[in-house]
Amino acid sequence: MFTIDFSDHTGLVETSWLDQIDQLLTFAKKKENIHNDAELSVTFVDKDEIQNINKVYRDKDKVTDVISFALEEDEPEIDFNDFDIPRVLGDIIICTDVAKEQSESYGHSFERELGFLALHGFLHLLGYDHMNDNDEKEMFGRQDAILNEFGLTRN
């Protein structure tokens, strides 16, 4: 089973969009060969809340579009198949204000931008990063491939 706990602090995210994000992340989980049970949370916040989270936890006093907190980061590899418990991946926090601005800037829907940011955060939870050119190419390539195969394109 794959459990995603959604929380919308903004009241801007429609239920159908949550369903689409659930389907997208479930699709991505399969594409990333995660076969065991897993869970994560996705929280939607405004600019003030994400800036505060960014300041407190990342020492960056600025607004951003998405923040991920991976629970397995810097932990030894655990084979979750040996235990009858779900793999807890972590938390994804998405700023709806920034998502709206970016969707308008890029010329695609708010719904598409929320899906993009959720997948971006999900890949961070799995260990992908974009701190250097090679990692960025790998992560963004994977992200684009999953979005395109799922059918959530920029159109």
From Swiss-Prot:
It comes from the Bacteria. It is found in: Cytoplasm. One of its GO terms (molecular function) is metalloendopeptidase activity. Keywords: Cytoplasm, Endonuclease, Hydrolase, Metal-binding, Nuclease, Ribosome biogenesis, rRNA processing, Zinc. The keyword Nuclease applies. Binds 1 zinc ion. One of its GO terms (biological process) is rRNA processing. Its EC number is 3.1.-.-. Zn(2+) binds at H120, H124, H130. Belongs to the endoribonuclease YbeY family. Single strand-specific metallo-endoribonuclease involved in late-stage 70S ribosome quality control and in maturation of the 3' terminus of the 16S rRNA. This is Endoribonuclease YbeY.
